[in-house]
Each structure stands twice: as structure tokens, then as C-alpha cells.
């Protein structure tokens, strides 16, 4: 009898375990659980108005209102408000139902912090126009420095403007050509001098 009771108890436990597994709702990727149902998520640009009524079925979704967006599949009850550009920024990408508005600092200013929560800064100017990298919306101007200031490292670069650089190159070329010509003339004179000495010795 004891053995029979153990078998009955094991059978009962197994049945309970199987029933528990059957009651667990496993949702697929792109679905969300609502009560005991798996509902499809809303697509980008829409939000959830009402969950589905049948398992693995579509939910009732509604499009985002003007100046609102959602850029991914979701089960949100409302869309997110689009960003608003400040007066020191300009719009580079418009707000849509599937993408937020993109703003950046206006020309001549920059902001190098994440999300640019502070005001845009005026771009630095370089003395004598020695610019290594021009200023843009996210980075300040980088200048070349002849002498490093205390605590700073400067690149020891002696840079020339384009017209001056061309003049220097031409002058160097002329000097080299002149030196070669002078060397050739000296060699010719030396050879002639040697011939004259040899001729005088023969005549004597």
C-alpha cells in the first residue's frame, strides 16, 4: 500500500507540474504580455491604445500626434515630445513621428558636452590665422602654438602661409641651381688651368 501511495503522489505532483507549465505564457520577441495573452508591440511612430484580445495578435495602436515621436517598437501609452531648439541653436533634422528633432549650435559657436544642456560658446580665434582644426558645432578651434604656455604643450611647428611658402620654395630652388652652376664653372676653370700648365711644360 505504501508503494502504491507513493506512486499516486508522484503522479499527482507530475500532473500539477505539467498544468503549471501549460499556464505559463511565453511571449516571442516583439510581443508583450497582457494578462494571459501575448500581444504584438506597436511599430515606431505609434503608441498603444488598447492591448490585443487574442493571443499573438495585433494590438490597437494610434499614430503619434504632431511634435511627438517614438523611434522603436513599443507598448508605450503615449509618444514622447520632440526636442525644441534654443535660440542659440539651429535645426538640422526635423521632428517626425519616428525621429526626434536634431539641433546644433549655430555657425561660429560650439558645445562639446553631451546633449549640450548649457549655452553654446563662441569659437576661439587663432593668432595670425594659425588654425590646426576649424571650429564646428561640437568642437572649438584648435590653434598651432609656437611657444607652449605653462602647463600646456604646444606643437613646435613653423608654418607659412601659402604665398610665402611658394616664395621660399622658389628661392631655395634658385639657390641650389646657382650653387650647381658655380660648381660646374669652377670644375671647367680647374680643367683649363691644368691644360695650360701641361702645354707650357711641353713647349719648354
Swiss-Prot record:
Annotated signal peptide: 1-19
Q: Which cysteines are joined by disulfide bonds?
A: 27-38, 39-52, 42-61, 64-79, 82-95, 85-103, 105-120, 123-135, 126-143
Give the record's keywords alphabetically: Disulfide bond, Glycoprotein, Membrane, Receptor, Repeat, Signal, Transmembrane, Transmembrane helix
Bilayer topology annotation? Single-pass type I membrane protein
Positions bearing carbohydrate: 57, 136
Pinpoint the residue ranges of every TNFR-Cys repeat in the record.
Answer: 27-61, 63-103, 104-143
Q: Which residues lie on this side of the membrane: Extracellular?
A: 20-164
- Transmembrane segment boundaries: 165-185
Name of this chain's protein: Tumor necrosis factor receptor superfamily member 26
Origin species = Mus musculus (Mouse)
Amino acid at each position: 500500500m505504501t508503494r502504491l501511495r507513493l506512486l499516486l503522489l508522484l503522479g499527482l505532483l507530475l500532473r500539477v507540474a505539467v498544468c503549471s507549465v501549460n499556464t505559463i505564457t511565453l511571449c516571442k520577441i516583439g510581443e508583450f504580455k497582457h494578462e494571459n495573452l501575448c500581444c504584438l508591440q506597436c511599430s515606431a511612430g505609434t503608441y498603444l491604445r488598447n492591448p490585443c484580445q487574442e493571443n499573438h495578435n495585433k494590438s490597437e495602436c494610434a499614430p503619434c500626434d504632431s511634435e511627438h515621436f517614438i523611434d522603436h517598437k513599443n507598448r508605450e501609452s503615449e509618444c514622447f515630445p520632440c526636442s525644441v531648439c534654443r535660440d542659440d541653436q539651429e535645426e538640422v533634422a526635423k521632428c517626425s513621428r519616428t525621429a526626434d528633432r536634431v539641433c546644433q549650435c549655430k555657425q561660429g559657436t560650439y558645445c562639446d558636452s553631451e546633449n549640450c544642456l548649457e549655452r553654446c560658446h563662441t569659437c576661439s580665434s587663432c593668432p595670425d590665422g594659425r588654425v590646426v582644426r576649424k571650429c564646428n558645432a561640437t568642437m572649438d578651434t584648435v590653434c598651432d602654438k609656437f611657444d607652449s604656455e605653462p602647463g600646456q604643450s604646444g606643437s613646435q611647428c613653423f608654418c607659412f602661409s601659402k604665398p610665402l611658402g611658394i616664395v621660399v620654395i622658389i628661392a631655395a630652388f634658385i639657390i641650389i641651381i646657382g650653387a650647381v652652376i658655380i660648381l660646374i664653372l669652377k670644375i671647367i676653370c680647374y680643367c683649363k688651368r691644368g691644360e695650360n700648365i701641361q702645354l707650357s711644360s711641353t713647349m719648354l
